[in-house]
Amino acid sequence: MKRLYCLLFMLLVLARINAGTPVKILAIGNSFSEDAVEQNLHELATAKGIETVIGNMYIPGCPLELHAKNMRTGARAYRYRKIDAFGNRVQVDSMSLSKALADEDWDYISLQQASQLSGLYDTYQPYLHALIAYIRVHVPTKAKIVFHQTWAYAQNSKRAGYENYGKNQMKMYRAIVRASGQAMRTEPIALLIPSGTAIQNARTSSYGDTMNRDGFHLDLLYGRYTAACTWFAVLFRRKVEGNPYAPKGMTPQQVQISQWAADAAARHPYEVTEIKL
């Protein structure tokens, strides 16, 4: 029944795309959602004739526990960054979750765990469950909950929390895969956006372990582009390969690697696919 419901919803989203109605996406996250959706996603969609409205509720390093606390208290704790259908960007400071949820008729609302906790499912609950229940009360039932699977750190990262995974990139990646899979099995989440797998796929290519600018945030060019390509492939149910948009400074081979890594992650979100470029 859940699969049928999700299929019907996707048909409605495709109908909105075909009708020229903006697809509205809200991320409740932190700097990792900033890396993924605040650049490139709007442009990738525009290149294929898809209008979008994209919002990001941003607190640096925010875990699910703090999001849930802000939900309970109504804290005006967020920077709300929004990209409208024309690509105009605005930021509203001191925003609450309830106001952001009411700001648009959202199609997708994403949740994610803070990066250092992303492979530790015990830290997800009861906060993930409470947030989903809250969203269901405050937005129309048509809005779909999606979960953003974030990425493992660079192998040589000095980021606090990396010791949770023995300072081992593949151990962290596998833990993230397990935790995100458990979230998908136990909660009414419609879609997984496997940015973590896309980044790990890209690391098998000639990029190597260069996907991060500081050991944990994404490279500003091809790192962020790879994540945005993954969101595009999953949300719009189409390959990103061949999309003509890429940010200035990327070579044709880099564009191909990022697009292939994203498409492979959309097909196989819980396993690494080697990219031979």
Question: Language-model features: where?
Answer:
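Boundary at the C-terminal end of the N-terminal hydrophobic targeting segment
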Residues: 17-19
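Structured segments of extracytoplasmic/periplasmic soluble domains
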Residues: 31, 35, 43-48, 112, ...
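Sec-dependent N-terminal signal peptides
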Residues: 4-13
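Alpha-helical cap/lid subdomain in secreted, periplasmic
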Residues: 94-220, 233
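Short, hydrophobic/glycine-enriched beta-strand segments
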Residues: 25-29
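Conserved catalytic region of serine esterases and O-acyltransferases that act on ester linkages
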Residues: 211, 215-218, 222-224, 228-277
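Residues that mark the start of a beta-strand
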Residues: 22-24, 53
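Conserved SGNH/GDSL esterase-like catalytic core that processes O-acyl groups on lipids
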Residues: 35-124, 141
